[in-house]
Amino acid sequence: MLQSFDPATGDLVWEGETAGPEAVTGALQNARKAFPAWAALPVAARVEAVQRFKAALEARKEALGETISRETGKPRWEGLAEVGSMIGKVGISITAQAERAGEKRSDMPFGQAVLRHRPHGVMAVLGPFNFPGHLPNGHIVPALLAGNTVVFKPSEMTPATGAAMAECWAEAGLPEGVFQILQGGRETGEALLSGDIDGLLFTGSAKAGAHFRHMFADRPDVILALELGGNNPLVAWDGDVEEAASVVVQSAFVTTGQRCSCARRLIVPDNEFGTA
């Protein structure tokens, strides 16, 4: 049994079954079966499906923002802002797909070079807990637009957000097996990545990314799209010190510090305010 709790109150937010090995295998088989037909659809049809997902997000924005807030401990305004980013990502992805996909030919000294983009297969997407909607959404939407099928495992800390996203995809009317969700912790994730996948799409910690690189070192057929977080220092060298102090505090503590953009180190010169 998997449960998530509101970190501010301790109240139960979500509970449900953890996906075991059989469920993982079944989801991957369904994704593999659905792939040829989904990949063969015209891009315009996939765009329409993603637009329906966007409409579902817009209709559920308040509820989804509240769910994100309750599971992560973010202020409600941050949860709503995250849903806004998810909605915006759809348009960005559609534009990027139109610019980058298809076939491109270039003249060469002894002929032509041809670049063709094609769907790759079954993509596994792992979601982090700090932006449980926006970050996995940034992988799922482009993957589906490109004609891949997706099996998504949210963070075990934010299953309710993942479930709400899955409801939006269901409302979009995707064919069976094109998008599936598996709830669970590390064991579920390891089972997913050990299965029949063609790619792993992940945004999260550098430590997790290093583990995945080692895990797939002997699988050159599996593409790895890893966006790995780290924290850079914030340098406040001159200017309005009072204003800089306000920005520093926001940078360190927004989203309770759980952002890759949160500064954990501050570099300042020695001045009338003292030494650092």
Question: Which positions does each model-derived feature cover?
Answer:
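A structured beta-alpha segment of the ubiquitous adenosine-cofactor-binding alpha/beta core
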Residues: 112-113, 180-198
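Short gly/ser/thr-rich secondary-structure transition/capping motifs
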Residues: 102-110, 181-184, 247-248
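Periplasmic-binding protein-like
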Residues: 141, 199-203
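Short beta-strand segments
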Residues: 126, 180, 203, 225-229
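N-terminal Rossmann-like NAD(P)+-binding subdomain of aldehyde/semialdehyde dehydrogenases
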Residues: 1-111
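ALDH superfamily catalytic-core signature
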Residues: 207-276
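Conserved small-residue-rich beta-alpha loop and adjacent elements
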Residues: 103-176
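Residue-level signal for inorganic ion chemistry
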Residues: 10, 46, 68, 90, ...
